[in-house]
Regions:
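Amphipathic alpha-helical segments
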Residues: 42-61
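Generic detector of ordered secondary-structure context
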Residues: 43-44, 78, 185, 208
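A generic secondary-structure signal marking the coil-to-beta-strand transition
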Residues: 49, 92, 189-191
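Alpha-helical transmembrane signal-anchor/signal-peptide segments
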Residues: 26-45
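A short, solvent-exposed beta-edge/loop patch
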Residues: 4-23, 30, 130-230
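Short, solvent-exposed recognition patches
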Residues: 55-181
Length: 230
C-alpha cells in the first residue's frame, strides 16, 4: 500500500502532540511536599473524654508488599502509622488505626481493610455505607462498614479513605479524585482511618465506634481535625 507523505507527516505530528500533551499533564507536584501532614503520633491524644489508652492491643495492620518498597520514603505506601487501643468508662475497647502515605497515585494506593484482613485469613463481608455526623453544621463523613470474621473472632469495622483533601471510599470515587488532582499537576497524599471492635454485636459495635470517632474528632484542634474529615 502506498503511503501518502502528507498523511504520514500529519499522523506523526498528531502522535508527537499527544505524547507531549500526556507528558505535560503528568502529575509532578507532591501535595505532601507543600502541605505537610501533622505528626499523627503527637496530635492524636492518648486520653480524651471517657477514653483512655489500652496497651498491647493486637491490631490487623495494612500490609506493605515487598514489590512496593523503595529506598525513597516518598515512594512508600505509608510513612506514618498509628495503631492504638482505647477503652471507655464501661471497659469497652475500640481498636483504632490511621495509616498515612505521602504518595497516593495509581501505583501506590491505600490498602483497604478487605485486603489486609483477607491477607490475615479473615472472611470479610456485609459491606455497607453510612454517613457519620461528628459536628453540628459540618458535612457528615461518608464511611464504609464491613465485618471481618476468623474462627470465633467477630470484628465489625468502620473505615474511610482520604485522597488529598477528599474522602473517597469507592474505587470509582478514588479514580475521579486522583484525576482531579492529576489535571492540576498534583500527586495527592492519602490516609486510611479505621475503627473496629471485638466482643459486641454488630449494632452495638457501630454505635460504640461512632461515639469514639465523634469524641476523638471533638478533642482535636480544627486544623488537625481537617486531616481526618477533609
Amino acid at each position: 500500500m502506498r503511503i501518502n507523505p502528507v498523511q504520514a507527516i500529519l499522523a506523526s505530528v498528531v502522535i508527537l502532540g499527544a505524547a507531549g500533551l500526556s507528558e505535560a499533564l503528568r502529575p509532578r507536584e507532591l501535595m505532601a511536599a507543600t502541605q505537610r501532614a501533622p505528626n499523627l503520633e503527637s496530635v492524636i491524644p492518648k486520653q480524651f473524654g471517657q477514653w483512655h489508652l489500652v496497651p498491647n492491643i493486637g491490631l490487623v495492620t495494612p500490609s506493605e508488599p515487598e514489590a512496593y518498597l523503595q529506598r525513597d520514603l516518598e515512594n512508600r505506601i505509608y510513612s506514618q502509622e498509628v495503631a492504638r487501643g482505647y477503652a471507655d468508662a464501661a471497659g469497652n475497647v475500640v481498636m483504632f488505626l490511621v495509616a498515612y502515605g505521602p504518595v497516593q497515585n495509581y501505583r501506590l494506593k491505600s490498602h483497604l481493610p478487605e485486603v489486609c484482613y483477607g491477607a490475615a485469613g479473615f472472611r470479610v463481608s456485609s459491606k455497607k455505607v453510612a454517613e457519620l455526623t461528628y459536628q453540628p453544621g459540618a458535612p457528615p463523613i461518608s464511611v464504609s462498614r464491613v465485618i471481618a470474621q476468623k474462627e470465633r473472632r467477630f470484628e465489625p469495622i468502620t473505615y474511610w479513605l482520604k485522597v488529598g483533601h477528599d474522602v473517597a471510599n469507592g474505587v470509582f470515587d478514588r479514580q475521579m479524585v486522583r484525576m482531579k488532582y492529576g489535571l492540576q499537576g498534583i500527586i495527592p497524599d492519602g490516609a486510611l482511618i479505621r475503627v473496629s471492635t471485638v466482643g459486641l454485636s454488630e449494632a452495638e459495635s457501630y454505635k460504640l465506634q461512632d461515639q469514639f470517632i465523634h469524641d476523638l474528632l471533638e478533642a482535636l484542634s480544627p486544623k488537625d481535625r481537617r486531616f481526618f474529615t477533609g
